[in-house]
Amino acid sequence: MMKIGVFVPIGNNGWLISTHAPQYMPTFELNKAIVQKAEHYHFDFALSMIKLRGFGGKTEFWDHNLESFTLMAGLAAVTSRIQIYATAATLTLPPAIVARMAATIDSISGGRFGVNLVTGWQKPEYEQMGIWPGDDYFSRRYDYLTEYVQVLRDLWGTGKSDFKGDFFTMNDCRVSPQPSIPMKVICAGQSDAGMAFSAQYADFNFCFGKGVNTPTAFAPTAARMKQAAEQTGRDVGSYVLFMVIADETDDATRAKWEHYKAGADEEVLSWLTEQSQKDTRSGTDTNVRQMADPTSAVNINMGTLVGSYASVARMLDEVASVPGAEGVLLTFDDFLSGIETFGERIQPLMQCRAHLSALTQEVA
């Protein structure tokens, strides 16, 4: 079975950088409605990112953002089955604090919580607070994250850490209570360094889908992750990010997609390109360089599935056929209606979710 998750819109306007796309602010009530609807349709998990400074432009893209841990704590309290993941911007939060917050949300959720660790690539997010460690950090960020996760594992596993490293020094550091079950750690490494980290420490790794209606184009990325995991003797699957834009017919959906592209906020796209060029130390295979690619920058170049309900179902089944692909993380042009049509019209047609069809119909 392929896992299905929703990438909740913690920032304004979700993931479409377009004046023609729905314009909305992030609120707890909106995200509660989205995640409860996702749970109703048997989505497996919900994840929120963290963004500390937006991209500006006419659409004020991501200038308005909630905070990930507090949002997901609230969502954990109003759900009962769906897995909940928050994102830690590790430059802003000491690992001992993240360990304690995660243990708290584990208690709120009844063991349904996990943590997504990010190193931070957007320099202005951290410069505005005076905590950017300098541009050498670009080349050492996974060294930093390795120490960070070792402290987390100590505290979650034993309740105590005396870790000593280049970045962190723990002196009989304590966290109790500990999580009720082993805490899941996820990452989104796409560079060689990121995948090596995920292979060693993550439970699964997110990657970008690629292109428009090319559902298996990410296969080389999944293969790289699989190969990296084989080096560590661990099973670390890939979860792939896609935007779903669906309607009754392929033509109607294609027209909607072209309309969104025609309204692209060029000021935001230029700024994103500029930011992607700031990191000259991490190589050419990072997530941010894919985000800024002009091919489909209107939705940050995540894989895009545009078509009728049947076409999208077929393409998601193709995703499931890729070796190493264990799940997808979905965004929608309109989240509330998108999740409903996914649950009612797309998921029942998916072979990789066929076992849920009868169950979904019972609760619909």
UniProtKB/Swiss-Prot annotation:
Enzyme Commission designation: 1.14.99.46
Keyword Transcription carried by entry: no
GO molecular function list: alkanesulfonate monooxygenase activity; uracil oxygenase activity
Keywords (A to Z) from UniProt: Flavoprotein, FMN, Monooxygenase, NADP, Oxidoreductase
SUPFAM superfamilies (alphabetical): Bacterial luciferase-like
InterPro entries, per the entry: Luciferase-like_dom, Luciferase-like_sf, Pyrimidine_monooxygenase_RutA, SsuD_RutA_monooxygenase
Binding site for FMN: 50-51, 116, 125, 141-142, 191
A Pfam family annotated for this UniProt entry: Bac_luciferase
Catalysed reactions listed for this entry: uracil + FMNH2 + NADH + O2 = (Z)-3-ureidoacrylate + FMN + NAD(+) + H2O + H(+); thymine + FMNH2 + NADH + O2 = (Z)-2-methylureidoacrylate + FMN + NAD(+) + H2O + H(+)
Induction line: Up-regulated by the nitrogen regulatory protein C (NtrC also called GlnG) and repressed by RutR.
GO annotation terms (biological process): alkanesulfonate catabolic process; nitrogen utilization; uracil catabolic process
Family the entry assigns: Belongs to the NtaA/SnaA/DszA monooxygenase family. RutA subfamily.
NCBIfam families: RutA
Functional description taken from the UniProt entry: The FMN-N(5)-oxide reacts spontaneously with NADH to produce FMN. Requires the flavin reductase RutF to regenerate FMN in vivo.
Protein name as catalogued: Pyrimidine monooxygenase RutA
Organism: Shigella flexneri serotype 5b (strain 8401)
Encoding gene (name): rutA
